[in-house]
């Protein structure tokens, strides 16, 4: 009988220990909300419209999941996939896609051998407190125009 009571108490103690350690493993993190993505996209679209450009804007969260995709009227369909690639590349490498494009331009083409990479200017990581919480990608114009519109989206984060 004492052995059964001991086993029961030991089992309960282990259950409590595992339950408390499991809950301690959850972390809180900031991520890109739909409202934030819409604010960024609106600023990016305004920048494109001001310059008579047509663009696609993609915003992804910290897992590379699509939060927002917007395609301005008249923008070529191919820009959808390019904008997604730029956003995911900026997220995965935690830097603007222009940095990867520059690496290739400097004669180091090994970057293009990496899987799932779009090494073309126009993708920017979204930073909060020094951590990447998502990314924005734009496509439809020249690479510089794409980045200008993506940057306008990032700048909207600092506006109240």
Which residues fall in each region the model found?
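Bacterial N-terminal signal peptides
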Residues: 7-19
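Flexible, solvent-exposed loop/hinge segments and secondary-structure transition points
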Residues: 22-160
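Positively charged n-region of N-terminal signal peptides that target proteins for export
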Residues: 1-5
